[in-house]
From Swiss-Prot:
Family: Belongs to the heat shock protein 70 family.
Official protein name in the record: Chaperone protein DnaK
Role summary: Acts as a chaperone.
Induction behaviour: By stress conditions e.g. heat shock.
Annotated region described as Disordered, given as residue ranges: 578-605
PROSITE patterns registered for this protein in UniProt: HSP70_1, HSP70_2, HSP70_3
Species of the source: Priestia megaterium (Bacillus megaterium)
Entry GO MF terms: ATP binding; ATP-dependent protein folding chaperone; unfolded protein binding
Ranges that cross the membrane: none
Swiss-Prot/TrEMBL keywords: ATP-binding, Chaperone, Nucleotide-binding, Phosphoprotein, Stress response
Entry keyword Chaperone: yes
């Protein structure tokens, strides 16, 4: 069975891992780094992903970052005049991860386990699955990030019974989950979170502070300058990371903008204390879900055995202090917060292929599910934190006399009124025989699969007529749209491959021109003039083809020149060999010496 890779598709960074010899292992990217920025850029029709895209973000307006924040919405991003859905952008990142995983493994990769924030709703999960499909991946399982982290942490400790709190603060999302580990069973007791809170927001408070300081000093508002803002974003991210290790950092951005008197420079010193003050509100926002999860699990903080920190933003000292204060214990430092989620996804891949035995994962649904009933009330069928997969049915009736159809409005959320919750979908059950209100019996069944994706069925118990829907949110993609995007993604992958081959061909041709010139210099006076002229003509023809950028011609002229140069090089070696042999022969004749020898008997020594 082919390997199933584990992918942590993050807001700011992504990571891919695989199970090798029973151990999960992170696959490094082509630059040698273990995580890849979730950044896509377009430049003259060419796509760039990861490190390369992030490096030129300052100067390229067609750079897309943090697209995960828009998953499951109808938000579109525009680049070079074309609009893309968040699914397509995520698919480009997934394709990049898939590509270098294939190079590392030396075999095609078609299956993956992809992680999502525990608090992702159905639309966001469906969008993630669609992104995988567009990238040419069969998404075997969608699992929650904190659950994956617990899996990576607890795999070696299956004989211990533990209650673990996973605090996951990523680039754009925040989750907290409480799990019980024991006998190879990883059971999620409760989960809570905020999908609009992460490291990006910590960067933003620094950016806002720098903009305010600069305006106070120079009277110029940098927030109106797109290029200055990108430089500020990079500087803010770096300052945030620096302040995890030092108590003060200097932010220096020369020539940030120009005033009436000439260029202006930004020089600001930021202390850790000031950063703590700026981000205090954000840190406090993460505490409410921690309290909520403990309450839902029916636990007090003292009953926790371990607190595990996941996500790069958990390196912020104020975050660590707050979680320590809230739970009364030091967070466990034995896992790499950037990699642990991908490692857990790879382990889940191993569970699915049968390479990892005796591990059972019991996840939960993060939000309650139900339908709208009379008066706009949200009636829950499945409560949040219910272990999945699960199904639940309830019988409803009509609200008016002689009603022949009912609208089933499916929602997800915790608020009592339908209008305040997230619509997952709507469908209609028709042809109900006319009857007084309250008489028809309509059974509504909810079914949540192992990926947390919802199916809903409505059945008229009188006629046995049934209507079913797999929830595809209003922002979801149709099968035709997905197929079109899959095709486009494949074409782009081919185009990227072709572009790479073209660049390599040009480089080889340039290299050949250089080596030819060097070889001809070495051959001066050693071969016939006609042969040198022939080589020079072929070299000039290749140079002209490179100038014209005609790939077919470059290939033909390169092969032609290579043949001529090889023949000349063979001649050069032959001449060198003949000269060497002649030299050795002469040396042998000169060195002949008559000698006498005496045999020594060892016994006499």
């Amino acid at each position: 069975m082919s390997k199933i890779i584990g992918i942590d598709l993050g807001t700011t960074n992504s990571c891919v891992a695989v199970l090798e010899g029973g151990e999960p292992k992170v696959i490094p990217n082509p630059e040698g780094n273990r995580t890849t920025p979730s950044v896509v850029a377009f430049k003259n029709g060419e796509r760039q992903v990861g490190e390369v895209a992030k490096r030129q973000a300052i100067t390229n307006p067609n750079t897309i970052i943090s697209v995960k924040r828009h998953m499951g919405t109808d938000h579109k991003v525009e680049a070079e005049g074309k609009q893309y859905t968040p699914q397509e952008m995520s698919a480009i990142i997934l394709q990049h991860l898939k590509g270098y995983a294939e190079e590392y493994l030396g075999e095609p990769v078609t299956k993956a386990v992809i992680t999502v924030p525990a608090y992702f709703n159905d639309a966001e999960r469906q969008a993630t699955k669609d992104a995988g499909k567009i990238a040419g991946l069969e998404v075997e399982r969608i699992i929650n990030e904190p659950t994956a982290a617990a899996l990576a942490y607890g795999l070696e400790k299956t004989d211990e019974d533990q209650t673990v709190l996973v605090y996951d603060l990523g680039g754009g999302t925040f989750d907290v989950s409480i799990l019980e580990l024991g006998d190879g069973v990883f059971e999620v007791r409760a989960t809570a979170g905020d999908n609009r809170l992460g490291g990006d927001d910590f960067d933003q408070v620094i950016i806002d502070y720098l903009v305010a300081e600069f305006k106070k000093e120079n009277g110029v508002d940098l927030s109106k300058d797109k290029m200055a803002l990108q430089r500020l974003k990079d500087a803010a991210e770096k300052a945030k990371k620096d302040l995890s290790g030092v108590t003060s950092t200097q932010i220096s951005l020369p020539f940030i903008t120009a005033g009436e008197a000439g260029p202006l420079h930004l020089e600001v010193s930021l202390s850790r204390a000031k950063f703590d003050e700026l981000s205090a509100g954000l840190v406090e926002r993460t505490m409410a879900p921690v309290r909520q999860a403990l309450k839902d699990a029916g636990l007090s903080a003292s009953e926790l055995d371990k607190v595990i920190l996941v996500g790069g933003s958990t390196r912020i000292p104020a975050v660590q202090d707050a979680i320590k204060k809230e739970t009364g214990q030091d967070p466990h430092k034995g896992v790499n917060p950037d990699e642990v989620v991908a490692l857990g996804a790879a382990i889940q891949g191993g569970v699915l292929t049968g390479d990892v035995k005796d591990v059972v994962l019991l996840d939960v649904t993060p939000l309650s599910l139900g339908i709208e009933t009379m008066g706009g009330v949200f009636t829950k069928l499945i409560e949040r934190n219910t272990t999945i997969p699960t199904s639940k049915s309830q019988v409803f009736s009509t609200a008016a006399d002689s009603q022949t159809a009912v609208d089933i409005h499916v929602l997800q959320g915790e608020r009592p009124m339908s209008a305040d919750n997230k619509t997952l979908g709507r469908f209609q059950l028709t042809d109900i025989p006319p009857a007084p209100r309250g008489v028809p019996q309509i059974e509504v069944s909810f079914d949540i699969d192992k990926n947390g994706i919802v199916n809903v069925r409505a059945k008229d118990l009188g006629t046995n007529k049934e209507q079913a829907i797999t929830i595809k949110s209003s922002t979801g993609l149709s099968d035709d749209e997905i197929d079109r995007m899959v095709k486009e993604a494949e074409e782009n992958a081919d185009a990227d491959k072709q572009r790479k081959e073209e660049v390599e061909l040009r480089n080889e041709a340039d290299q050949l021109v250089f080596t030819t010139e060097k070889t001809l210099k070495d051959l001066e006076g050693k071969v016939e003039e006609a042969e040198v002229t022939k080589a020079n003509e072929a070299k000039d023809a290749l140079k002209a083809a490179i100038e014209k950028n005609d790939l077919e011609e470059i290939k033909a002229k390169k092969d032609e020149l290579q043949e001529i140069v090889q023949a000349l090089t063979v001649k050069l070696y032959e001449q060198a060999q003949q000269a060497q042999q002649a030299g050795e022969q002469g040396a042998q004749n000169d060195d002949v010496v008559d000698a006498e020898f005496e045999e020594v008997n060892d016994d006499k020594k």
